[in-house]
Amino acid sequence: MSARPQADFDGKAFAARLSTAPGVYRMYAADDSLLYVGKAGALRKRVGSYFNGTPKNARLTSMLSQVARMDVTVTRSEAEALLLENQLIKSLSPRYNVSLRDDKSYPYVLLTREDWPRIALHRGPRAVNGRYFGPYAGVTAVRETLNLMHKLFKLRSCEDSVFRNRSRPCLQYQIGRCSAPCVDLVAAQDYQEAVRRATMFLEGKSDQLGEEIMHSMQQASEALEFERAARLRDLLSSLRSMQNRQYVDGRAADLDVLACATQSSQACVLLLSFRDGRNLGTRSFFPKTNGEDSAEEILAAFVSQYYAEHAPPREILLDREIPDAELIEAALSAAAEHKVALKWNVRGERAGYLLLASRNAQLTLVTELTSQSAQHARSEALREMLGLAEQVKRVECFDISHTMGEATVASCVVFDASGPVRGQYRRFNISGITPGDDYAAMRQAIERRFRRAVEENGVLPDVLLIDGGAGQLAQAQAALADLGIENVLLVGVAKGEERRAGHEALILADGRELRPGAASPALQFIQQVRDEAHRFAITGHRGRRQKARMTSKLEDIPGIGPRRRASLLKHFGGLVGLKAAGEAEIARVEGVNAALAARIYANLHGLALPDAAGESSP
């Protein structure tokens, strides 16, 4: 059901037409932007409560004054309404809802779904088909887990392109960390069993897994399968050893601890996780709030939204009672297909965990606010130095990175008054220019970034920093002029005397030059943005350069065409395997004679190339 926009929306009349069924309601402004999404056990009663004439707080009063229309979706239950509400908040980001910011930056353990699953570290969107375990507190924790997985279960970690083209086992097999499914050294049934056990381990079921392995070991021994029994014994021993090293508290076997701190219209939710008694560390989240949401409301929204995306443990400790706790508990239990308990009145060790999480949430929030305050002060100093009338809301910076003209990459980083906005960073692979021409590279990057903004009516920065002197600045200025963009302030950041930090010169589009000095907060802000652009550019350049060099080594050898190159890489499982081979071994590849093998070996090892006469490239 939906009401179309009206000058004075009659919410009371709209509510009277609703049913008493559970569902989700949405409020829209006159420009059709979404203001708020809410759930209701009874739509008529809940929606009507907004328009019953009773006094409302400032946030609600402001929101309701903007409502031009509403619509609703009826659901079968209030629990279903809760799930739909979470999905809509995540996908639509309504202005007045508490919203959990995306946590794509946190790393996961990925176990792919394919005939021969691989296990690997994953960060970013979940585009790969598989199970994602986590998120973990950091990359180190993921690598420790992967190390255990390889030792215990010998699952592959190689990319599919390498896996499909190997003809002999890799080093991981030689050191006992992979079962070499790439060359059929493990039966499919045995590999799938290892995958199943690894899944149990990652789900926090190591005790159950240990009992299962012990039972299988006893069965193998009774059946006189002593070799299999010995392998299972070693696996069980490794598992027990790992448990003894990492066990923290048997009573915290599968547990999350959540605490919420609020201050100055901002909030921090701190998550402390235990899985199978192992402390996985803490993660901090800063939900988007409206300044008037209570800590209880923020924590309730966090629990609903976070566990809609991540598998909940059986027990979740909260530092305070939250609204709709029973409903949220029921919804989480139904989705997880096991009982999930939300608790806040706890004693003993668990009370200690809550106290620890609460203190850390407060400390983390204070640290974040202090950092934001300093960042805002620097942003304000930049505004004053550049003589801008309004606050600097968005700064972008471009930098170019290459090695003697090779693999040129341009970076664009974005900052607002609170710091970096990493989700909006961009890299541009530069092509079609004279190698080493930084001016042309800068112009191409600026044109590509801002042409799209013009075509899609995208956001423009208030200040555009160019890492370079007057030449690079002129190229950026010309590119913007060609696109008809005039309301962006351009600033070139030229290196100072002896390239020393703090001595940079800021070159404006009108030719003026500013030298604010090392103590200037404005220059410190610019340095921070410029250094981040440099880091982002050089990281992209190194990746592109490495990829180009890996693929071009064979292409540079006379007598190696596409078919021979593919045969060589397939035979040796990649360039690393080929480089480790001797001339005689290379010559055994179909289509490669001794002379060509000698040239391949010489090229890969930096030796003088033999004469290529008489060879052709198939």
Curated annotation (Swiss-Prot):
Gene Ontology BP annotations: DNA damage response; nucleotide-excision repair; SOS response
Record's keyword annotation contains Transport: no
Domain GIY-YIG: 20-98
Domain UVR residue range list: 207-242
GO cellular component term, pick one: cytoplasm
InterPro entries the record matches: GIY-YIG_endonuc, GIY-YIG_endonuc_sf, GIY-YIG_UvrC_Cho, Hlx-hairpin-Hlx_DNA-bd_motif, RuvA_2-like, UVR_dom, UVR_dom_sf, UvrABC_protein_C
GO molecular function: DNA binding; excinuclease ABC activity
Keywords, comma-separated and alphabetical: Cytoplasm, DNA damage, DNA excision, DNA repair, Excision nuclease, SOS response
Principal subcellular localisation of the protein: cytoplasm
Subcellular location: Cytoplasm
Pfam short name (any one): UvrC_RNaseH
Record carries keyword DNA damage: yes
The family this protein is said to belong to: Belongs to the UvrC family.
HAMAP family assigned to the protein according to its UniProt record, in alphabetical order: UvrC
Subunit structure: Interacts with UvrB in an incision complex.
Function: The UvrABC repair system catalyzes the recognition and processing of DNA lesions. UvrC both incises the 5' and 3' sides of the lesion. The N-terminal half is responsible for the 3' incision and the C-terminal half is responsible for the 5' incision.
This protein's name: UvrABC system protein C
Organism, as annotated: Xanthomonas campestris pv. campestris (strain ATCC 33913 / DSM 3586 / NCPPB 528 / LMG 568 / P 25)
